[in-house]
Amino acid sequence: MVSKKQKFLTVILVIVLAIVIVGGVFGISFVKGRVTFPWQLQNSEAKTEQVKEPAKEEPKLVIKEKKQDESAKKEQELKKAKEEAEAAVEKETEKTEEEPVDNLLNDMKLKYYGKLAVEGSHLVDADGHEVLLMGVSTHGINWYPEYASAETIKSLRDTWGINVIRLAMYTSDYNGYCVAGKENQEKLKDIIDDAVEAATDNDMYVIIDWHTLNDADPNEYKADAIQFFGEMVRKYKDNENVIYEICNEPNGDTTWNDVRRYANEVIPVIRNVDAIILVGTPKWATDLDSVLDKPLDFDNIMYTYHFYAGTHHKAERNALRDALDEGLPVFISEYGLVDADGDGNLNEKEADYWYDMIRKEYGVSSCMWNLSNKDEGSAMINADCDKLSDFTEEDLSESAMWLIDQISQLKHSDLEQGVDWITPENNNR
């Protein structure tokens, strides 16, 4: 039987053991942090906030640093791209200066339409569609035969895109056809023959121009003209691209009646073939009023009008406009952007007015004066250039570059469809 004392000691021992066990458990939990005691709660929350706050800030710092790195990288890439672009532009500029001007035209060429005719006031193709001839006039082939060469004609067709060239053969000036003997006549005809062949090979029209000038009245050498054009027609009867200009610029006291009398005798010789014939008008090819009063009674006839932008302005444009509105068929076989004497500075403002009128308003065909390297404002080749082809910008005058620019502005559809380039413009200029 257990005594009271033993029972008491046993209870005491159990209590001590319980205290030891519970204390051990709490001690271990406290050290490992698995149990949170009430007195630990406030401190634990504070520590949690301290831990959480850096967790919010650290991603921001990382993102900001990343953005800065990306921004710096983009700036480097942009700088590199800009340097490469500038280098490319500089290289292309050098290339443009060295290469022929065909790059300016993107290889566009004015259309060749085949056989032409005159209907009303318009030059048309075989289907009756209006056409546009744009090109150049040589200076006198008596002085500058080299620019009527096959090399030059092919180059201008390929690089400038023109579709007509006018061969200015002077009749009474230096080495003129009518004043320098038979041998000279044969040389001039050989030049024409080579040029006609080159134009034909390159799908171009060619104007054979009986270039009267100091012989103010074309009747002075009428017999020579009849003989010459008779020979030309027999030689080129099968060339539908040949156009005949029977006199250049009647001047002085020459009247339209004088020109009319001359034309009535020369035209029948050419009319043996149904070619286009251009007839010069009085007062240096500016008097269309006289023609309106008494036009010629032939088919496929056009009347020439000449202007120089430095000399001829609004009054002359109005005179041409009146004639065109009356239905007179006009061909501008010679024009320049400088003064009427062929020299002086380019008058670009007036030139643009003229061009807008003759091309956009009326679609009048034209040839710019002059294809040579003569030291004067109207020459298209610079005086220090002796090349005959593959001209660069440095080789060309302002007049030539203006013409190339005008051709380059024509739309592709304009070149192929003919009438789309006729756009009414403001007439008050």
From Swiss-Prot:
Lineage: superkingdom: Bacteria
Entry keyword set: Carbohydrate metabolism, Cellulose degradation, Glycosidase, Hydrolase, Polysaccharide degradation, Signal
Protein's UniProt name: Endoglucanase A
Keyword hit for Magnesium: no
Active-site residues, record numbering mapped to chain: 249, 334
PANTHER family found in the cross-reference section: ENDO-BETA-1,4-GLUCANASE A, GLYCOSIDE HYDROLASE FAMILY 5 DOMAIN-CONTAINING PROTEIN
SUPFAM superfamilies: (Trans)glycosidases (SSF51445)
Organism per entry: Butyrivibrio fibrisolvens
Coiled-coil residue windows: none
GO molecular function terms attached to this record: cellulase activity
Signal peptide range: 1-34
EC number: 3.2.1.4
Recorded catalytic activity of this chain's protein: Endohydrolysis of (1->4)-beta-D-glucosidic linkages in cellulose, lichenin and cereal beta-D-glucans
